[in-house]
Design a protein with these regions (language model features):
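Gram-negative and organellar
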Residues: 1-3, 7-8, 22, 36-39, ...
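N-terminal targeting signals for Sec/Tat export/insertion, comprising classic cleavable signal peptides
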Residues: 2-30
Length: 652
């Protein structure tokens, strides 16, 4: 027995266990050997066997020994609970049993030793974190601190993780830095700290940390004397984190390249495929992300990130029934997951009411400060309200529109006020809406208007649409002043290869009731020029060409030929952001020549400044001012404008 104690002191527990076994074979009633065998089993990680031995002869153990073995058993159950379960339906079986045991011990035989009582409460923090009961983790941690109990460093990363789950990254940072004071080289704690900094928008600190972690983790480290290296999964985690950080810093292209390189090395890694799918989704490729997540789920049907990625992709591809079907079992398996709760809320918003309200007001004056000849009028404005019902049959909505457009032409105010009712079908690739409206103003009272729109998504990059209108509200109010209305037919093709580039070509013909026809062709696009975590710089380009059917004289702006080209830049600056809440300011400046037949060409500058708010519940508010110096019939004018736009629940 003395030799066994010496071996235990040398951390040679297996050799000590062999001695206790020999003693017990000779004398099964040897209490000393029996208790020390149980304690040694617990030291070796076999806490369940130790507990079973203690339950057979509890009076052979001291109170301290009983408490230690019980707590070891609970701790071991919590440790095993972190392993991937064979059956996902029993994912939390060990965790829940551990929490039941903690409650039973505290209720029936609370530890008398201060350390064992503290240890039980500390270990329960890990179990609660596994169960994603983050509020309980933080509350219990704060209770320990309030009692003056020093929480062991090994559990501080768990507390930090729960604070991150509650979206309290500043507090998480403080806890994680405290943990690193005790173990500055701990990889997982440093990784969590990087995420905490990232979620505070501290890219200046987060990016160097992620870069350093990736650079210092060898992919195949080799121990002394080994013939080959071993897999370093910390390097894998560092690469995933670095790609995530680059994406958050508006460098999706770099994140995509990094993960594609890793996928080429390990294509059968489900977590890696799911990570790349999330980057593809952020780049505006939901179909590609859906396909890659399907690959990940083929490799691992329980991969959580891939499953939630499928829900997001199906939602954005307007397949809400499939998204809901995928989400239901995921939500059941992870009932306390805060991220999934937010994903579920986004699905409900997408299925619910959708409202859009916009208002614009402007004024135009010419250089001589006399009455402007602008086709928009001296003063002009518009108000639009769109509302659509929750989904009916997973595809249909019923909607209404109310619109008021007006303009002052010298001493006359011309108005087009209308009310519309219709239906909207949207599912998968097809988007069709049909509305009927009635004019409510004196210029065309009780005039019936129709609007039909159809769109088709060819791929992640290509989208085409057709539009047909009678009594088009976008037709000239100058013409409406003389009782002339305009119908229109148009087509558009949009190409969005990624999150950095967007181009659209539109063709439209206006057919006025006086027999006049106007054809218009517009090309517009933007291309990312430079990006940083909080500033985006895009190049802008626009070109247009229009023509009238003939040279007839009309009482509204109708140039025989006109064209324009403009180029400029757009600067987006993220002034403040906290998860789904954000404030951005945007400045756009363009300049280019415009041509009108009979009047030659001149250069036209324009500028606009806007504020954009993301309000956290799927709604968005933007407002701004604009300035330009357009030319009509050879006369230069100055236009000033203000506009406001609010969307709630999605885009009608």
């Amino acid at each position: 027995m003395q030799q066994a104690e010496q071996l235990r002191g040398q951390q040679r527990h297996a050799d000590a266990l062999a001695i206790y076994e020999r003693v017990l074979r000779a004398n099964p009633r040897d209490r000393g050997a029996y208790t020390m065998r149980a304690i040694t089993l617990s030291d070796l990680g076999s806490a369940q066997l130790a507990a079973e031995a203690m339950w057979r002869h509890p009076d052979w153990f001291s109170q301290q020994e009983r408490e230690r073995i019980e707590n070891d058993r609970v701790a071991r159950m919590i440790g095993w609970a972190s392993a991937e379960p064979i059956d996902a339906a029993h994912r939390y079986a060990e965790t829940d049993q551990a929490l039941v045991n903690v409650a039973r011990i505290e209720r029936e035989s609370p530890p008398t030793l201060t350390w064992e009582a503290t240890r039980l409460r500390v270990d329960s923090l890990v179990a609660l974190n596994q169960r994603q009961r983050h509020r309980d983790v933080v509350a219990n941690y704060q209770a320990l601190k309030a009692e003056g109990i020093e929480v062991p460093a090994y559990v501080l990363p768990t507390v930090g993780d729960s604070l991150m789950g509650l979206r309290r990254p500043a507090e998480a940072e403080a806890v994680l830095r405290q943990a690193l004071q005790h173990n500055p080289d701990d990889f997982n704690t440093q990784l969590l700290l990087g995420y905490a900094l990232l979620e505070q928008e501290r890219f200046d600190l987060a990016m160097p940390l992620f870069e350093r972690l990736a650079a210092t983790q060898a992919p195949w480290p080799r121990r002394n004397g080994a013939s080959s290296g071993y897999e370093n999964w910390d390097r894998f985690s560092a690469d995933i984190a670095l790609a995530t950080a680059r994406s958050a810093a508006n460098h999706n292209r770099d994140a995509d390249a990094l993960l594609r390189e890793r996928v080429a090395i390990g294509p059968d890694n489900a977590e890696l495929q799911a990570a790349l799918a999330s980057i593809e989704f952020r780049r505006g490729h939901p179909s590609a992300a859906l396909q890659r997540n399907a690959m990940a789920l083929t490799l691992d049907p329980h991969q959580k990130q891939a499953r939630s990625g499928v829900v997001e992709a199906q939602r954005d591809l307007d397949r809400l029934d499939l998204a809901a079907a995928t989400f239901a079992p995921l939500r059941k398996e992870y009932p306390d997951d805060a991220g999934l709760q937010r994903l579920g809320a986004s699905l409900e918003r997408q299925r619910g009411w959708q409202v859009h309200l916009s208002h614009a007001r402007g004024r135009s004056d010419n250089d001589t400060l006399t009455n402007s000849t602008s086709p928009l009028g001296n003063d002009f404005g518009s108000t639009l309200l769109e509302a659509e019902s929750p989904l009916l049959g997973e595809r249909w909505r019923v909607g209404l529109r109310a619109r008021d457009d007006w303009a002052d032409f010298q001493d006359t105010r011309v108005r087009y006020r209308s009310f519309w009712l219709g239906t909207h079908y949207r599912y998968d690739r097809l988007d069709v809406s049909a509305y009927g409206g009635r004019a409510l103003d004196e210029f065309d009272r009780d005039g019936t208007a129709w609007a039909l729109d159809a769109g088709w998504r060819f791929s992640d990059a290509w989208y085409g649409s057709l539009a047909w209108r009678t009594r088009d509200p976008d037709a000239s109010l100058q013409a409406r002043r003389f009782g002339i209305t305009g119908d229109s037919i148009g087509a558009a093709l949009r190409w969005t290869p990624n999150d950095e580039s967007r181009w659209e070509l539109q063709a439209r013909q206006l057919r006025y009731s006086d027999g006049n026809r106007r054809d218009q062709l517009d090309l517009s696009g933007s291309q990312r020029l430079w990006a940083s975590p909080h500033v985006l710089l895009d190049g802008l380009f626009a070109a247009s060409a229009g023509r009238a059917k003939d040279d007839r004289a009309v009482n509204y702006f109708n140039p025989r030929r006109n064209s324009a080209v403009a180029a400029g830049v757009r600067i987006d600056q993220i002034g403040w952001r906290r998860y789904d809440y954000a404030f951005r300011q945007r400045l756009e400046v363009t300049v280019g020549p415009t041509y009108q037949s009979g009047f030659g060409s001149q250069w036209v500058p324009s500028a606009a400044y806007r504020h954009l708010w993301s309000l956290g519940d799927g709604s968005a508010l933007s407002y701004g001012v604009s300035w330009s110096r357009p030319i009509y019939d050879g006369r230069r004018e100055q236009q000033l404008g203000f506009d406001l736009d609010f969307r709630w629940g999605g885009t009608p």
